[in-house]
Amino acid sequence: MIARIIGEIGIEGARFIEENIDEQFKALRYLSKGIDSETFVKLVIANSLVSYQLTGKGEQWWWEFAKYFYGRDVKSIYLAYKEFLPNSRFNRRLIPQKLSRIRRVETFLSTLTEERIEEYYGDMSSLWGSIARALGVDKESKTVVFSVKMFGYAARIVLSTFNPYPMEIPIPEDSRIVKLTKKLTNEKPRKFWMKIARESGVPPLHIDSILWPLLGGASIDSAPPELRDKLAELIKIIR
């Protein structure tokens, strides 16, 4: 049932949700207008890697991030976060651990020229491996796969081009997804949603884009009628 509905929504439906319903994408679009492209993409990756154990909703955190960095001159991403996180409203836990992550990934981020960003956007699986190696963590770690998703958003905004996510990158095991998975199955989230991805033809990161805003209570009123009907059907299952 859920694979059928997600298949009917499809990648183009997921794209509509990402660009018009997901507050994270809206926050990034806002920030992109107030900072240079390279710094924008670097910040988005860095922010993704510290987006855990939040003290508010993910939507609130990404808007706080976007408003904080809009128009700001960022010389060092590590130093910027050393100032930002302790004063953050929605991300105040485990600050030393999060700053350590930023420090570990900063050398990799410094390699992201506009040309390199475009190359990685054409091969997001390669980016996935590069971020995991820079951090020294498992590729399937929640924040690593999430950082690829958010890089995809940022690169799409900067390059004005849509590239679908690779099928092999798993869904981020965020609390909303974990809770929903328990409601639907006894399988592990990553395994279950990879199976749904293969059945529906919609890559796991796009499935995440469909589910995550809806689980957060996002309105579907802006969707075209046909897509809105499918989303309403999906909401009955997941909420």
From Swiss-Prot:
Name of a matching Pfam family: AGOG
Superkingdom of this protein's organism: Archaea
Its EC number(s): 3.2.2.-, 4.2.99.18
A GO biological-process term: base-excision repair
InterPro entries noted in UniProt: AGOG (IPR016544), AGOG-like (IPR015254), DNA_glycosylase (IPR011257)
A Gene Ontology molecular function term of the record: class I DNA-(apurinic or apyrimidinic site) endonuclease activity
Stretches of the chain forming a coiled coil according to its record: none
Region Helix-hairpin-helix, residue ranges: 118-182
Keywords: DNA damage, DNA excision, DNA repair, Hydrolase, Lyase
Residue sites binding 8-oxoguanine per the record: 24, 51, 62, 146, 172, 208, 212
Catalytic activity: 2'-deoxyribonucleotide-(2'-deoxyribose 5'-phosphate)-2'-deoxyribonucleotide-DNA = a 3'-end 2'-deoxyribonucleotide-(2,3-dehydro-2,3-deoxyribose 5'-phosphate)-DNA + a 5'-end 5'-phospho-2'-deoxyribonucleoside-DNA + H(+)
Keyword Hydrolase: yes
Keyword Lyase: yes
Active site: residue positions: 142, 174
Entry's family note: Belongs to the archaeal N-glycosylase/DNA lyase (AGOG) family.
Functional summary from the UniProt entry: DNA repair enzyme that is part of the base excision repair (BER) pathway; protects from oxidative damage by removing the major product of DNA oxidation, 8-oxoguanine (GO), from single- and double-stranded DNA substrates.
UniProt note: domains: Contains two alpha-helical subdomains, with the 8-oxoguanine binding site located in a cleft at their interface. Contains a helix-hairpin-helix (HhH) structural motif and a Gly/Pro-rich sequence followed by a conserved Asp (HhH-GPD motif).
Protein name: N-glycosylase/DNA lyase
